[in-house]
Amino acid sequence: MDYYDRIRELTKNVPVELVDFEQPRDLARTPTQASSNFITNKEQGDWAEDLVTRAINENSKNFVAVKYGKSDNLVAGENGFDTFYQDFQTELDTIGKRPDLLIFKKTDFDTTLGFDVSQIPHHQITDYVKKAIAGIEVRSSAFLIDKYEEAMQVRTQRFTEIAFQTRDKILAEFLDVLDHPSRSKYITLLNTLTLETISIFDFKVPGWRSNERLIEVNNLFKRLKVAIKEIQKRDYLSITPKVEDIKVVYKWIETFNVPHFYFQVFFDKVYGISFEQILTIISNSDNDGVIFSVEKDVQNQNKTTIKINSKTGYPIASKVDEPTHESIRKEMDRGRLLFYVTFKGGTAYLDLDNLRTILGIEEAEF
């Protein structure tokens, strides 16, 4: 069974409530206006792509990373953007979504096309693309993952202590208030709160206000509710494939039969995961809420995004030197000004063993 056949079989296991491969993709509306935040995110994504490209090309003797993903410096509201965007939508339906990078063996690398084939019409490079050994979609995240995880551990510990201290205070000081037929169920409820159940624990705050003692215990239940909500928040940073992209990535694999991967670039590390593993993870409902969640991403135009725990993937770079950055002024139509941030430089220190493993490259070859 070749790569495409394996992926096709995996798509049959993905819940249709998440991705229905039998239905055509939803048509996208052309954006009408860009924002400073959108352009900054785009610049950050371009930097992350360049970071991975340079890291591979500077460390590999036998492989080359080539820019491939459809992109343009135009943004919504500028002349020519509507045409670019509609051409992009047509290409999505024709060949699928180009990954940002292609990895070629140097023996297959076309020096006349060079390191950037992103502007070449797809029908002119079909056979060339099929020679690639991998396609990589590069995602970026404006976090330091190590510091984030440290902060989440501190947060979880703090609110766990608050939750159990509050529970104990209620049971120790307000048992007389709760020992009433209409309120005794809260005693049973509090006794079921343990380290094992706190991640799924939920209750409705009573709303008692008829006397001072009831108001006091009601406020303690409010504090307990807040602490539990904090504990139950997602506490990991993610590899972030958009739900709308799953179909068009599959279409690209169907067209070219080239293995596809997602690399998530943080400002201190890079993690990678295969599209094959993504489909395997989201096909298992037992993983939902444990190693992945499905959320509306406010940082990405509120698009529905699959958020997979980064630690599920491979650490591709164990360290990243941060880029330099500067503010840019951009004048739009009618004199509207946008100010955004650009990123330059930086270095990703690759874990070559993990990179070879995820891409399926023998050590002697790399």
From Swiss-Prot:
Pfam families per record: RE_AccI
Subunit structure: Homotetramer.
Residue stretches spanning the membrane: none
Organism: Acinetobacter calcoaceticus
Presence of the UniProt keyword ATP-binding in the record: no
Keywords: Endonuclease, Hydrolase, Nuclease, Restriction system
Gene Ontology annotations of biological process type: DNA restriction-modification system
Catalyzed reactions: Endonucleolytic cleavage of DNA to give specific double-stranded fragments with terminal 5'-phosphates
GO molecular function: type II site-specific deoxyribonuclease activity
EC number: 3.1.21.4
Underlying gene: accIR
Keyword Transferase: no
UniProt superkingdom: Bacteria
Annotated protein name in UniProt: Type II restriction enzyme AccI
